[in-house]
Design a protein with these regions (language model features):
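An N-terminal, well-structured beta->alpha segment
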Residues: 1-43, 51-52
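Short beta-strand segments
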Residues: 43-45, 67-70, 117-122, 181-187, ...
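A glycine- and small-aliphatic-rich helix-loop capping segment at beta-alpha/alpha-beta transitions
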Residues: 55-65, 79-84, 104-108, 131-144, ...
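Glycine-rich oxoanion-binding loops at beta->alpha junctions
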Residues: 71-112, 154, 158-159
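Internal gly/pro-rich beta-alpha loop/helix module
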Residues: 134-220
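Accessory alpha-helical/coil subdomains and C-terminal extensions
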Residues: 177-180, 202-283, 287
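Active-site segments that bind and position negatively charged phosphate/pyrophosphate groups
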Residues: 263-339, 347-348
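Internal helix-turn-beta structural module
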Residues: 324-410
Length: 410
């Protein structure tokens, strides 16, 4: 392993994530918060829910009750006056349903003088859920979508119609109370109705689109689910104010600044990366190989969210697969590629992403690993573990997509 490049990668990752932590972003958004004279209730959902709620309660001084639902391992302690729950992601589980039921109960019977502060971040589609079909069927449909390679917009177009809280329905449940929503964006282009499936945003998708997606991926659906896909969701809400704060653009900008401080000349390739993870990795590896040997230190940055088509039975995530796919092109070069999820998790693993450099391919071959066979089996985690290329940050408390970087030192 190239220890200098790995050290640089770790510094860039740390600086990038620190720049998009929700604390300051929430406090900035609260400058525009004007609650009515009645009760102020807080509901937070998503991977960043605990940190967002903690920052909000500290800034406001008090709330009259609240519910937080976040991913397992993401609750960092008690928040005064708030009930905190952990639940399943990327597939909702019984705790997702139970916590969301608590949130719905909290907002029942509110008046026009009451205010709901709704804090939303990525992951909310799984964590904040009250299904309109049996829970087991919703889990099966979610697994089908995850395995199909459907992108996040396609997935959420389906999930909205199978939920009592998505697609604007949570805001309807809060009415006539005012809803002030603060959103951390984890979807490219920041489409508010798609972030966590838009519980407090009028739905911009149509039932025709939902049915087309179901047909495209040949989803196995019950008659009840098919009927729900054919029904429209709320298209207008008059009790909601929404403020977006934090996005992949800020993540990429922070990565570029960190690269600059380490002596690299950074170039942002895109902040809308959306393709197969291994294709993105191969591309970044090819870029690094093309520019290797130059005197100037270079950094190529890509932000977004790739997808993985599951064909094997291995363990990994999109960032780990992206990194491993870059390893063959980097062989023998003074270059590295790393990719990390800003939330600190990547797939069903304890890793946030993966790192490879010019030594990785040879190190894996010496241990009997074939990169291409490993990618076919979707087993990037164990290969990177063998090459000491796992990136483990722990839960970060934020979630604004992923960032991948190719570093070239000459």
């Amino acid at each position: 392993m190239n220890t200098t490049l790995r050290r640089d990668a770790d510094e860039i990752i740390h600086a990038s994530i620190q720049a998009v932590l929700p604390d300051k972003a929430v406090c900035r958004a609260l400058e525009n918060f004007q609650p009515r004279d009645g009760r102020v209730l807080l509901v937070a959902a998503g991977k960043a829910a605990w940190q967002m709620a903690h920052a909000a309660v500290q800034a406001l001084g008090r709330v009259d009750g609240g519910v937080v639902v976040t991913k397992y391992g993401h609750v960092k302690g008690e928040i005064p006056g708030i009930s905190c729950y952990e639940a399943g992601h990327p597939v909702p589980d019984a705790n997702s349903f139970a916590a969301t039921e608590k949130a719905l109960a909290l907002v029942q019977g509110l008046t026009e003088e009451d205010t709901v502060l709704f804090l939303l971040s990525g992951g909310g589609s799984a964590l904040f859920e009250q299904p309109l079909v049996p829970g087991g069927e919703l889990q099966d449909i979610t697994n089908q979508l995850l395995a199909s390679g459907a992108d996040i917009v396609e997935m959420n177009t389906i999930r909205k119609r199978l939920s009592a809280v998505k697609g604007g329905r949570f805001a309807q449940a809060c009415a006539p109370a005012k809803v002030f929503s603060i959103v951390l964006s984890d979807i490219l282009g920041d489409p508010l109705d798609m972030i966590a499936s838009g519980p407090a945003v009028p739905d911009g998708s149509t039932c025709a689109q939902a049915l087309a997606i179901a047909e495209k991926y040949q989803l196995r659906l019950s008659a009840q689910a098919k009927a729900l896909l054919a029904q429209e969701t709320p298209k207008a809400l008059d009790n909601v104010t929404t403020q977006i704060t934090g996005s992949v653009r800020e993540l990429c900008a922070a990565a570029a600044e960190a690269c600059r401080k380490l002596g690299y000349a950074p170039l942002l390739l895109t902040d809308r990366l959306c393709c197969e993870a291994r294709e993105a990795g191969s591309f970044l590896g090819a870029i690094a190989r093309t520019h290797a040997g130059q005197e100037k230190k270079l950094a190529f940055i890509a932000g977004g969210e790739t997808v993985v088509h599951l064909t094997g039975k291995g363990l990994g995530g999109r960032n780990q697969e992206l990194a491993l796919a870059a390893a063959p092109a980097l062989a023998g070069q003074n270059a590295a590629v790393f990719s990390v999820g800003s939330d600190g998790t990547d797939g069903p693993t304890d890793a946030a992403g993966g790192y490879v450099d010019g030594d990785t391919a040879a190190a894996l071959a010496a241990k009997g690993w074939n990169v291409f066979d490993t990618l076919k089996n979707n087993d990037a985690y164990h290969a990177l573990q063998a090459a000491e290329g796992l990136i483990i940050t722990g839960a970060t408390g934020t979630n604004v997509n992923d960032v991948a970087v190719a570093l070239i030192t000459g």
